[in-house]
Amino acid sequence: MTEAVEVRHDWTRSEIEALLDLPLMDLLWRAQGVHRASNPGYHVQLASLLSVKTGGCEEDCAYCPQSMHHSSDVTGQPELQVAPVLERAKAAKQAGADRFCMGWAWREIRDGAPFEAMLQMVSGVRALGMEACVTAGMLTDGQAQRLAKAGLTAYNHNLDTSPEHYDKIITTRTFQERLETLERVRQAGVTLCCGGIIGMGETIGDRASMLQVLASINPHPESVPINALVAVEGTPLEELPPIDPIELVRMIAVTRILMPGSRVRLSAGREQLSKEAQILCLQAGADSIFYGETLLTTGNPAVEADRELLRTAGVQANWLSASEKLAA
C-alpha cells in the first residue's frame, strides 16, 4: 500500500526552484513516488477540445494567434451552433474521450444568445455522460452560477505565466483579474482548470513563481494544464525557439510534486514532441492529454497515434472524474 502524500499550500519559491534544479533522474524518482500514490493503476484521462468561437479576440496575449491585435492568419469566425458542437462531442466520446472542452476566443462572457447557447452546450455534453469544460475569459458571479446549474464540470482560466513576467505577455487583463475569475468559479462550485505556458522568454524563477501561485490555491486546482509555447507566425513571440522537451518534463514533474491530487494535463506543444518525450512527460506525472485532431488553433496528434502512445507507455485511458478522483 502506497503511503499518502502530504498536500501543502505553503511551498516557497526557493523550494520550488530547488526542485526544478534537481538532477533529472532524482526529480523523476520523486515525482514518480507522488504520482503512483495519487494515481494507482496509472490512468490517463482523455480530453477533447473544440474551438466554438475562433479568432477576433480583444485580448493581446502575445502567444495567441486568435488575438485581433496580431497579424496571424487566424481570422474571426462566427460561433458554432449548438447541434454541431454536440455532434463533435458525441464523436469525441466514441473515440474514447470522457471530457469535452469548449473554447471561446472572448475577453469575457457577455449575457445574451451566445451565452444561452453555451449553457445548452454544457447541458448537452453532460447528458452524453461526459465532463464539460469551458474556457471563455472572465465572467460574473451570476454567469458562473448559471454555468454550474447547467452542469459545468470545470472552467479553464490559466495564469499563463508568473506575476513578474505577466505584463510582458498580456496588457489587456491583469494578473489579479485572473485570480478573481478563479475565485468566482470556485464560489459557484465549479472545479478549476488552471495552469500556464513555458517557453515565452521567462526565467526558471518565473516558472517557480507561477507554480507557487498555483500551489497556494486552496484546494489546489483540480486540473493543471502545462503548455509549451507553440510559436505562431504573426504573433509577437513568433521567433522564439521551441523549448527543450526536458524542460517540459521537469515542469510536469514539479507540478506533480506540488499538487499531488490535481490532474496534470500535457497540453499545447505536445504535437512538437517525439513519442519518447511524451512518454517521459507521462512518467513525470502527466495524467491527462488532449486527445484527437484539434487543439484550438494548433495541431494535435491524431487519435490512432494517441492510442498507440498510451499502449507503448503501458498506461490505461480514463479513470475517474475530477470530483471522484478528489474523493478517492
Curated annotation (Swiss-Prot):
One of its GO terms (biological process) is biotin biosynthetic process. Pathway: Cofactor biosynthesis; biotin biosynthesis; biotin from 7,8-diaminononanoate: step 2/2. Belongs to the radical SAM superfamily. Biotin synthase family. InterPro entries: Aldolase_TIM (IPR013785), BATS_dom (IPR010722), Biotin_synth/BioAB (IPR002684), Biotin_synthase (IPR024177), Elp3/MiaA/NifB-like_rSAM (IPR006638), rSAM (IPR007197). Catalyzes the conversion of dethiobiotin (DTB) to biotin by the insertion of a sulfur atom into dethiobiotin via a radical-based mechanism. Binds 1 [4Fe-4S] cluster. The cluster is coordinated with 3 cysteines and an exchangeable S-adenosyl-L-methionine. Binds 1 [2Fe-2S] cluster. The cluster is coordinated with 3 cysteines and 1 arginine. Residues 42-267 form the Radical SAM core domain. Keywords: 2Fe-2S, 4Fe-4S, Biotin biosynthesis, Iron, Iron-sulfur, Metal-binding, S-adenosyl-L-methionine, Transferase. Homodimer. Its cofactor is [4Fe-4S] cluster; [2Fe-2S] cluster. GO terms for molecular function: 2 iron, 2 sulfur cluster binding; 4 iron, 4 sulfur cluster binding; biotin synthase activity; iron ion binding. CDD domains: Radical_SAM. [2Fe-2S] cluster binds at residues 101, 133, 193, 265. Its EC number is 2.8.1.6. [4Fe-4S] cluster binds at residues 57, 61, 64. The keyword S-adenosyl-L-methionine applies. It comes from the Bacteria. This is Biotin synthase. Pfam families: BATS, Radical_SAM.
